């Protein structure tokens, strides 16, 4: 068995920052801080190897682990001068998880471990403070009971509140030692009820706490968090055991969290909060509203503890320069002595991540490439957050702390269960006293989070920022009535389903929906996206067929349109009746008449699109979906169609019945329509080239057209349609006395097309991989029906991910690779693109980069994400 325990502390460390895989993120940080000679409590890290052993050996420990653990504690006793379980100078321990990737609040922590009646009495004597010792004992029983014995936390809360009410006490600080003794006795009875005995042996407590932390790796909340954030389950967690230092020892003791820069905005200034006479869990849990470290407030740390503040400031600067990244630092002050408990790379909003990355390049701390690799592409969704339009003279109903930026409007829900249930049909705002890790699913589906308690570093704030969701915390002027399920704001009483709006950028809460402003990119955002474009090889295009989508795409930096689904233009209310006439018409003459009515409308559509895109390439896919999608379904629409064609309703119903297909997505669609009903493609080609000619003549715009034929499976299909298209273009060139320049391509979206790509490539200028249909036809799974079994497949690990979100590299990816290799063998100048939903997914973009595609085309609001992902792929793979 490999080494399981690594020491750290005032005498140096066995490990360092590079050992995250075995020490976890927290343990590696503690080891590195020891090597930097920073003031940290002595301790040791149990490696991730134990977690992996635990889960592969029926939740048991290795043979010699208990002896190693006892040796480690004895070494800790020697360095601290305290003894574990002693009734003279007791050593108390903290037991904390430490996964490789930070998972704030998702796993378990136990403080003050080693407590029993005798140790509590000894601690009171040593510290000359009986109340402090009793308070520490109470905290231990509550935390150990909830974490190790699975006693519901609210049972402890009920006991505590009952005793306070009976004693006519309202503030925690007024609870007397005598009352604490009564509370502790009731807590101990609760332990006996659930565990059949009170566990008083310190080593038994320690072993059971270690098992509890290991078990929390597979807790429901941790599993959900890993799924949401794509964190591997196989990495396991380390465990960090440290000698306790007490932030709740006196009025010169405190606990807090400090960020070396603002996690919300990225501003270069220290930002954080602390609580006097408190332990670390008090600030992280959000049960008390903390004080600022820096502010004009006389209660700030800078004002009340200036010497400690200066030391903390210097350590913060040291850690940021050492790690070359913004740090999230937890600390405790015990009788004016500062201890650093943890440092880690700080979670931050996308706005902050970009600002910090750019700042650090300007400060010559990191390179542009390093800056780009620091950005989570998916987090750029946050740049698209709306904000409230305050020019409308709005009045808020409450004010809190701006914990995570962005504005959200939704109905009030008071539980994560209701959030999950109602989010299918409504946008919801989750309203809680404070959030806990158990709320993770409800937070994930909510549009925004509002908490009554907690600060900028509470669980709600940290998790919301990581999710990119608006969050307001510490709204002390709001009251939740749990029994009546109402939210009280002064004289206003709100119930579930009432609508509110929260502003996570200002901390304000409004009644109802309020006017919102769409976001704009900061100068730093524009700059880092420019760096991305300079770095990447893949060009990023967009899927667009409307002027509004095209304008948004150009604004977000699209280099062209990679997929214009021409059929989407047909659904306009002015066109759909003509499309239906074209499809249902009983003879060719009537069909051609309907087509001619559509022609000028299609021409104007294409003209408007080309005008927006200017000299950027525009790839237009000719009509693809089955005709049934355009046909009327309501009786009213059927009657209107019968009237416009001057046909009896019975004949319309006969035609509709005759056109019914059992499996239309694999039926009469795509190129098959163009071959069987050539007048449709002829009309589209005429409209496209007429639009190009008119823009050239009237506005001197030179359009870059790419014309794409869908759903090819046989080279003869492309040959037939290619001949028809070129014949039509030749007629148009003669009519307009103008020579047209364009590229002809096809979508590779069927396995047979991929396998026969050598022949197909001889007939076209480019391939565009339609990964949606290619995935459907490779798997034999309908994208519309996969939801009925996908959750079970993911749970049973049959699928690692949704194949319609993350490209299947083994199956679909191999078909793409075959198509590229064979296509290039017959046409070396063949251009390559991809235009399915996968084209906006970072992992899939990395695959497309490795396949040497020329571009990917994604939805407009995925463009910034794709630009960063393409740059990262180039940095990783060259």
UniProtKB/Swiss-Prot annotation:
PANTHER family: PHOSPHOENOLPYRUVATE DIKINASE-RELATED, PYRUVATE, PHOSPHATE DIKINASE 1, CHLOROPLASTIC. The N-terminal domain contains the ATP/Pi active site, the central domain the pyrophosphate/phosphate carrier histidine, and the C-terminal domain the pyruvate active site. It catalyses: pyruvate + phosphate + ATP = phosphoenolpyruvate + AMP + diphosphate + H(+). Residues 1-347 are annotated as: N-terminal. Phosphorylation of Thr-457 in the dark inactivates the enzyme. Dephosphorylation upon light stimulation reactivates the enzyme. Keywords: ATP-binding, Kinase, Magnesium, Metal-binding, Nucleotide-binding, Phosphoprotein, Transferase. Residues 503-537 are annotated as: Linker 2. The modification Phosphothreonine is found at residue 457. The reaction takes place in three steps, each mediated by a carrier histidine residue located on the surface of the central domain. The two first partial reactions are catalyzed at an active site located on the N-terminal domain, and the third partial reaction is catalyzed at an active site located on the C-terminal domain. For catalytic turnover, the central domain swivels from the concave surface of the N-terminal domain to that of the C-terminal domain. ATP binds at residue 96. It comes from the Bacteria. This is Pyruvate, phosphate dikinase. Mg(2+) binds at residues 749, 773. GO terms for molecular function: ATP binding; kinase activity; metal ion binding; pyruvate, phosphate dikinase activity. Belongs to the PEP-utilizing enzyme family. Residues 405-502 are annotated as: Central.
